[in-house]
């Protein structure tokens, strides 16, 4: 999986490009977040094209899978609409690689319904996306109908977008490698028997 481009640039971008329309992102866990280009600007297209060209020069033509999360664990949209953002990110990705598949992490509030709706604006957009339900063994997002679940799309299974059942056994300072065995024993068979869009 290669890196996808969603507009991240260095915080000092204006030292190199005075015309870049950006949104400062502040901090995440005391680390400075990268600045984001506005996807509505012509600068975004220019930088996306350059990013994919340079990445191909470095790695070669090795993959059609690209991971990027524009506002993972927060971030500031600066008034931009999430549907517009995802439409533009996917459009530029497909422009660079007609067979591109955008790998999207389902974590916390991501992907939002608006982000998923933006995929639908691109021809066969959901065919160019694959969602990783990162903590599916404990907190599945594909099953939005369960009690207490947040909505991840207007329709079932991330708006009928292909997705993967993932297990995240070690994160956030948890040093032991273990799983939720009762959930695994029950949920994995349920997923394969009751879902339609698992990849």
Describe every region a protein language model picked out.
Residues 1-199:
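Catalytic-core regions of glycoside hydrolase
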């Amino acid at each position: 999986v290669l890196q996808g481009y969603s507009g991240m640039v260095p915080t000092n971008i204006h030292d190199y490009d005075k015309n870049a329309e950006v949104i400062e992102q502040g901090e995440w866990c005391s680390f400075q977040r990268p600045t984001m280009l506005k996807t509505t600007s012509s600068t975004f297209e220019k930088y996306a094209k350059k990013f994919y060209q340079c990445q191909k020069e470095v790695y070669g033509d090795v993959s059609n899978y690209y991971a990027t999360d524009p506002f993972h664990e927060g971030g500031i949209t600066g008034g931009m609409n999430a549907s517009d953002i995802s439409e533009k990110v996917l459009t530029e990705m497909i422009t660079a690689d007609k067979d591109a598949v955008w790998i999207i992490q389902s974590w916390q509030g991501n992907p939002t319904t608006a982000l998923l709706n933006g995929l639908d604006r691109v021809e066969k957009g959901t065919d160019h996306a694959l969602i990783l339900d990162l903590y599916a063994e404990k907190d599945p997002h594909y099953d939005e109908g369960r009690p207490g679940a947040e909505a991840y799309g207007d329709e079932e299974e991330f708006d009928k977008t292909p997705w993967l059942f993932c297990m995240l056994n070690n994160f956030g300072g948890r040093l032991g490698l273990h799983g939720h065995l009762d959930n695994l024993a029950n949920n994995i068979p349920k997923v394969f028997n009751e879902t339609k869009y698992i990849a």
